[in-house]
Amino acid sequence: MADKYIVEEAEALAKRALHSPIAQATPIYEQLLSLYPTSARFWKQYVEAQMAVNNDDATKQIFSRCLLTCLQVPLWQCYIRFIRKVYDKKGAEGQEETTKAFEFMLNYIGTDIASGPIWTEYIAFLKSLPALNLNEDLHRKTALRKVYHRAILTPTHHVEQLWKDYENFENTVNRQLAKGLVNEYQPKFNSARAVYRERKKYIEEIDWNMLAVPPTGTSKEETQWVAWKKFLSFEKGNPQRIDTASSTKRIIYAYEQCLMCLYHYPDVWYDYAEWHVKSGSTDAAIKVFQRALKAIPDSEMLKYAFAEMEESRGAIQSAKKLYENILGASTNSLAHIQYLRFLRRAEGVEAARKYFLDARKSPSCTYHVYIAFATMAFCIDKEPKVAHNIFEEGLKLYMSEPVYILKYADFLTRLNDDRNIRALFERALSTLPVEDSAEVWKRFIQFEQTYGDLASILKVEQRMKEALSGKGEEGSSPPESSLQDVVSRYSYMDLWPCTSNDLDHLARQELLVKNLNKKAGKTNLPHVPAAIGSVASSSKVVYPDTSQMVVQDPTKKSEFASSANPVAASASNTFPSTVTATATHGSASTFDEIPKTTPPALVAFLANLPIVDGPTPNVDVVLSICLQSDFPTGQTVKQSFAAKGNPPSQNDPSGPTRGVSQRLPRDRRATKRKDSDRQEEDDTATVQSQPLPTDVFRLRQMRKARGIATSSQTPTGSTSYGSAFSGELSGSTG
């Protein structure tokens, strides 16, 4: 719908019509005004084109179509020019028609802040009327005084100039009476001038040339919407403290002007109609709703609001027609439900029941209709048996809908029918897909916590864990019981058996365990190339165990961070791209939870890693290996090196393995290689018969034992100098 409302194309068409002959311009204007019927600028351009060729009949027809819906001063000035052109040469009859036209115009737009020139023109026209005798002169002066009084009470741009003209007028007529009249109207003028200054602030924020298009959420549209809301609120406050009739007139004028720009905004139409209802003018509200549905025919909101107003004032047949109109335009479950409720209110139970029997046969009927009618029968008609039968009938069709199961369970709970509730849960959980059964399991547990004993509660919880643990991957074992289960079991509404800090701690632990178990066993270390391919093609990314992180102070730049480390550099280079890919292709919810447990110091450290040119490993594979590795603690490392000598420096890029080998004598290293050769066959058999170790150092020894001869002849391998996430050194060759 919004595709046809292209402002740039409309402006281009208007410009083309402006320079085209009237025969070619007319269809262009008609096309424009069919899309933008409240554009006073396009109407003015159209009518001026007809006036230029003296096509008076077409001009009158155009004015009859636009004047009352486009309350803008330039368009109405064009109207008064046309009237004066037609009637100026018709003598007294023409003067009378012109006077009526001025009064008609000021009755509609006389409260506009830009209407000052119209007041001035009207006063000048009255002064120009001939006075053949004293009575006519007196009548003319009385008419002028009345117009002046109306003009100086209107907060317009020309209010001060009109006040000066009024003072001169009174002094010219009668100096003795002038002082009394001027003093009487001075406070009223001061009030109008003060209101004008405030009014001007709101008017200046409004773009009067804005074309009415359906809302698209642009900043300009929102700004204009806010500006109009402020202006309407200002006018509703009656800042000038004028009488109710005059204030109502100004508010109506403000709403009509607002609709020229916000013609496709249903909230503006609704506010306008509601204001009429609160003001006691229901007939005016009906007209507003009728215009609104003509402007936005697809708005169900406005149709429901209109039907509600008609029903509230007792116009049942009018409301029924509106509901039937909704059903005819878009037959959906919501329309069925709302019509059911209306029939129940307006015509009784039997009418609603009869319609339900027809509605359930409709292709657009869903489980919502069954729930709504069953609830209506139970709550309003006090017929639990009827409601139970409706739920049972719907269960045959919607057993696979978790929401329907839960609503049925709620109904049985209100009946205190615990036997049928258990039967319902068992029936539903035996047929529901695992991925759709989580909420039903939770409700089953809540039910057991209320109606069952401890054994039944624990049994259902265990069944839920076993059922839901297998929905992700085959062979996964059900999660073990945790303190989180106890908290869930013994909490009630917003009451918890622990503090908020305990809850946060348990939540973090649950997240870490979830991340650890999620990918445990998926990466097959002897087949690293296959693992690389699977990680690259999958949107599920393995994340590190953040609980074992070593806090890094970013203010202290160590040699490890500053060294030309290809692995660390690759982590620095690929980490943002990995993050972006994860957030784009999936697992966004899991990834969003990781930064919550990442220390700020580590984030700063990763951001400051230098960029190094060279080959970069796949970060996902490196992290998956590190995640499954059982790194020795600091105390274990110290004890290990205490037996062999001083531990190597953490700043040594060669790692602990290289540091030890450099301090061993040559013959010791040779002996070590011979021992490895002699045990190669035994080690190979042992490795093949045992599961792969999770220790990266043991894995390195296994690979070294397998390929020591090849690696000694052809130096191919890789060395990992540490994990950018843990801060510990590791080495591997193979």
From Swiss-Prot:
One of its GO terms (molecular function) is mRNA binding. HAT repeats lie at residues 20-52, 54-85, 93-128, 139-172, 198-237, 246-278, 280-312, 314-345, 347-379, 382-414, 416-450, 474-505. One of its GO terms (cellular component) is nucleus. GO terms for biological process: antisense RNA metabolic process; embryo sac development; mRNA 3'-end processing; negative regulation of DNA-templated transcription; post-transcriptional gene silencing; regulatory ncRNA-mediated gene silencing; RNA 3'-end processing. The keyword Lipoprotein does not apply. SUPFAM superfamilies: TPR-like. Keywords: mRNA processing, Nucleus, Repeat, RNA-mediated gene silencing. Residues 709-734 have a biased composition (Polar residues). It is found in: Nucleus. Residues 664-677 have a biased composition (Basic and acidic residues). Its main location: nucleus. Residues 637-734 are annotated as: Disordered. Homodimer. Belongs to the CSTF complex. Forms a complex with cleavage and polyadenylation specificity factor (CPSF) subunits CPSF30, CSTF64, PCFS1, PCFS5 and FIPS5. This is Cleavage stimulation factor subunit 77. It comes from Arabidopsis thaliana. The gene is CSTF77.
